[in-house]
Amino acid sequence: MKLLFKLAILLSSVTGLMSAAEKVCIDPGHQAKGNMQTEEIAPGSSKRKPKVAYGTRGVATKKPEYQLALEIGLKLRDALKAKGYSVFMVRETNNVNISNKERALMTNKAGCSVYLRLHADAGGSSARGATVLTSSAKNPHTRSVQKSSDRFSRAILSEYTKATGF
């Protein structure tokens, strides 16, 4: 419950960076069953990786990452909708088979201007903190949105660390 309270604080701070006209995509990471078939990691790339990895599990709670990500994603969806935002959910159930590439295509097709992919990554027992990833300025497929993505990502990380103390 503390996490959800902190998420609400974060949300209140960061939503000022977006207009209510923008559509937000929430992609709760992973799913009940991984898909170890491979796909390219980006358009035109020769590098491949599994379509969807299995994810991790909480050390204390034993809760699977895919389940936690969906629970948080649904609460975030409801909070954003209550503030007037249009929200697209990549998944609303754990029993899906959606590859990483398919998730990106779904988001683009939905016309989302903000893409939030939720994960609870694993680390050593002393690991604490948060990670925010954004596209590279060198990526030709995301060059037009890279600066705004970077600014938004940094704001999320800043507000998250203020709200959680990490």
Where in the sequence are the language-model features?
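Catalytic-site microenvironment of enzymes
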Residues: 2-166
